[in-house]
Each structure stands twice: as C-alpha cells, then as structure tokens.
Swiss-Prot record:
Natural source organism: Corylus avellana
The name this protein goes by in its record: Major pollen allergen Cor a 1 isoforms 5, 6, 11 and 16
Family of this protein: Belongs to the BetVI family.
SUPFAM superfamilies: Bet v1-like
Effect of residue 11 to T: In clone COR A 1/11
Cellular compartments per GO CC: cytoplasm; nucleus
Phenotype when changing residue 46 to G: In clone COR A 1/16
Further information: The sequence shown is that of clone Cor a I/5.
Amino acid sequence: MGVFNYEVETPSVIPAARLFKSYVLDGDKLIPKVAPQAITSVENVEGNGGPGTIKNITFGEGSRYKYVKERVDEVDNTNFTYSYTVIEGDVLGDKLEKVCHELKIVAAPGGGSILKISSKFHAKGDHEINAEEMKGAKEMAEKLLRAVETYLLAHSAEYN
C-alpha cells in the first residue's frame, strides 16, 4: 500500500477565526445551504461532531459520486485545525483504502486567511494515484470555500 501526499493552500478574504467557525465548525449546516449542487446533506451517524464522530455526506446531483463517510480525527478551536478521514464511499473506488485530510486556517496579511489542506491518499495494494486523481479533492475544497466566502461577504453579521 502506497501513500500519496497532496498539499494545497487557498487564500481567502475572510479572517481565520470567522472562516474556521463557518467552514469547519458549522460547515455541516452551512455548506449544503450555500452549495447544494456539491453537497446536499451531512448527517452525524455517530457522535456529536468531535473526534470519533462518523458523518455521512451526500453529494449533489451534478457530482460523479454519491456519498462518503468521514471520521472526525481532531478539532482544535484554538489553532484552527481540523482533521478527518474518508473511510467509506464511492469516491474511494477500487484504488483507495482511505484518504486523510488535515485542514489548517491561518491568518494572512491584510486581515484575510489561508486555508491549508494536506491530504494523504492511502492506496490499496499496488495501485498508483496520480496528481490528476488527487486534484478533484482540491477543486472541491476550493469551490466550497468560495461558496462559503461569498455567503459570509453577503451576511457580514454572521459567524463573528
């Protein structure tokens, strides 16, 4: 089994604390509201949102995937970090055992922030994972970030 790493940084005009609160802590409710074409629902199957929680995420009709199950590994409200593992779903296909994601939101000059995502794709057997296959996760994260950002800019009193 090989592990393939992929890292991406996406800038945002939203301050780090506000982005973490909306995109991460309340993302289960906010993202289906602002990007229903991407994600229609997030349901806690087990747990209360903290480490060990299992979530079932249903993708929108336009997606090539139907669902994933994720396990929350860590939530750090002080350092704005969140890590989770995709443990089930058609997104894993026959090549992947799991995908581990670590998100960190850091302050950027000028009052905005940077969303840093580090992903580890754990392949089954001798399967190779190429950059093109990993790029889908980056594109999805960026689309969701932009949808949340647009919402926050239009609703300046929320998530402060």
